[in-house]
């Protein structure tokens, strides 16, 4: 069974970049070689701040989307600092599921 990761990088300009992968070491090396995402190419070097593991690609991609679109920078930094990314993501999914149940 594959393992999937949502990861957060800090770029040289102190901005954050979030992505997903199956191989953290390889992906970090790819980013730092300038062959990663367009966003990180001009912000090298990057360093890994946090990663969260998942059993399936969909959860890793959903966590990436949630981190990018549902949180502001202050929230992101707090979750990273307190190692709460996965816990808060699961809470978000549970709340979302409850809302969907009540809407039906």
Curated annotation (Swiss-Prot):
InterPro entries: GIY-YIG_endonuc, GIY-YIG_endonuc_sf, UPF0213_domain
Database matches in Pfam families: GIY-YIG
CDD domains: GIY-YIG_UPF0213 (cd10456)
Top-level division of the source organism's lineage: Bacteria
Record-annotated GIY-YIG domain positions: 2-79
Family as reported in the entry's similarity comment: Belongs to the UPF0213 family.
Name listed for the protein in its UniProt record: UPF0213 protein YsiG
Organism from which the protein derives: Lactococcus lactis subsp. lactis (strain IL1403) (Streptococcus lactis)
């Amino acid at each position: 069974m594959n393992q999937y990761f949502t990861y957060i990088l800090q770029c040289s300009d102190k901005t954050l970049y979030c992505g997903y992968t199956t191989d953290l070491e390889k992906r970090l090396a790819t980013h730092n070689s300038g062959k990663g995402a367009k966003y990180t190419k001009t912000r090298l070097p990057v360093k890994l701040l946090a990663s969260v593991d998942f059993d399936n690609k969909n959860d890793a991609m959903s966590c990436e989307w949630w981190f990018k679109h549902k949180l502001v920078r202050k929230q992101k930094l707090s979750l990273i600092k307190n190692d709460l990314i996965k816990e808060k993501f699961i809470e978000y999914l549970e709340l979302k599921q409850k809302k969907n149940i009540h809407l039906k």
